[in-house]
Amino acid sequence: MSIYQSIQDFISLALQNGTIEPLDELYHRNQLLHFLGLNDWAEVDKEAHEKDSLILMDQLLAIANENNVIEKGQDEFYEAALMNFITPRPSKINQDFWEKYKTSPDAATQYFYELAQQVNQVKTRDITRNIAFSHLTKYGKLEITINLSKPEKDPKAIAAAKLVKASSYPACQLCLENEGFYGIGNKPARSNHRIIQVSINGEDWGFQYSPYAYFNEHSILLNAKHQPMEINKRAFDNLLGFLDQFPDYMIGSNADLPIVGGSILTHDHYQAGRYEFPMAKAELREEIKLQQFPEVSCGIVNWPMSVLRLSSKNQVELSKAADELLKKWQVYSDESLQIKAKSADGKLHHTITPIARIREGKYELDLVLRDNNTSEIYPDGIFHPHPALHHIKKENIGLIEVMGLAILPARLKTELLEVEKYLLNQENEMSEIHKPWAEELKETEYFSKETVHETVQEAVGEVFEQVLKDAGVFKDNEVGQKGFYEFINFVNN
């Protein structure tokens, strides 16, 4: 197919998406020719030969590279700017989204999600590179992902970033100002990035899909203001308010304290999606009564972390009950279990990771109790993956991991292959950090070429299960569960 046919097919997508009107076609063509380093044209078929936007993207990027128009280390920025040619303006997308919303919330989100994939805002090809498997436990099936989707910066891009003058705009990667931002240095390319303007409880928010999605329709609800994360009654109201508008999605928040929180605490945001996580499938271990809230059902979830599940048709009472539990947890200590609400200097150590959904006509809130205390033995966190597990997972246990989906570092793809060679007594370059674990596996398992890969994955699953147990404040044993019931009594008194 000729380069001009590729360009014409790309323009056809812009027309189809409503990015341009028919009268804009010649103008759009000339802008695109210049962008690709071309100054000529040959007539081609108006009817598209290729309709896959990502194949066309590859073809046009090849043209740009041939014409030397992409500067060293600028591939990511140029690619996003190219896809911006077929991405409708924010006003057009918002108008179409809310028009489709009149049919149903599902129609609106499906429109936006499909468009985000087509214009490569959601990087579907990169996401398919992830390695995924599961691990069956007494709590249900945990999910494990080795995250390969986010490409490593090449040396040229790193060198180019060092030469860029520091900028405070946008203030962070979650600010609304990223929409359409070309990108510079260590600030990612967002030319083709679009955000839906949403009102939640009278506040302005933005709804976008995550470029490197960890689960189906992984989306982010971000505050229009650059302000810190905070778990409080307002947060519970926001989660439940979002469900009123998008009942087919779940939504949750990272905790708002270091160690137990996510990677971005400086910008208020939540994560949502059309996905049932392992924790959502977990049943109640035992139902309990909240004396002050007769309209709210409550129970302890059968999960390695310490989770209370609240359920009610009454959204107001549900939010009040969650707030009461949060306030009680923020002042509760049990030093026999190393649970300590405050430091001597008054610093708070307790918060909650909340997750909301609608199930069988009722609002449901899972409240995961978190404690970010440290000690001499556990300087990274008492309720954080312990050092023996750091060879697999040492990062914070955020919202997604809490719900039973491990996001493991890309290094494990090659490192685990070397572990397999070691277990088969083959020549290997296994990292020393895996040696104690691998030696333990060797003592307990017989390995063959046919079974070693699956057995190592199973062992990784066991590590993730232990990671969640380490993060649990009331351990799943007799002493820990006794402590959990003492906390419930404290809540009710």
From Swiss-Prot:
InterPro entries named among the record's database cross-references: GalP_uridyl_Trfase_II, GalP_uridyl_Trfase_II_CS, GalP_Utransf_C, GalP_Utransf_N
Record annotation: effect of changing Q95H: In strain: ATCC 7962 and NCDO 2054
Pathway given in the UniProt record: Carbohydrate metabolism; galactose metabolism
TM segment ranges: none
Annotated localization: Cytoplasm
Catalyses which reaction(s): alpha-D-galactose 1-phosphate + UDP-alpha-D-glucose = alpha-D-glucose 1-phosphate + UDP-alpha-D-galactose
Alphabetical GO biological process terms: galactose metabolic process
A GO term from the CC aspect: cytoplasm
PROSITE patterns noted in UniProt: GAL_P_UDP_TRANSF_II
Keywords for this protein: Carbohydrate metabolism, Cytoplasm, Galactose metabolism, Nucleotidyltransferase, Transferase
GO molecular function list: UDP-glucose:hexose-1-phosphate uridylyltransferase activity
Known EC number: 2.7.7.12
Consequence of substituting T128A: In strain: ATCC 7962 and NCDO 2054
Protein family per UniProt: Belongs to the galactose-1-phosphate uridylyltransferase type 2 family.
PANTHER family, A to Z: DUF4922 DOMAIN-CONTAINING PROTEIN (PTHR39191:SF1), GALACTOSE-1-PHOSPHATE URIDYLYLTRANSFERASE (PTHR39191)
Designated name of the protein: Galactose-1-phosphate uridylyltransferase
Species the sequence originates in: Lactococcus lactis subsp. lactis (strain IL1403) (Streptococcus lactis)
Gene: galT
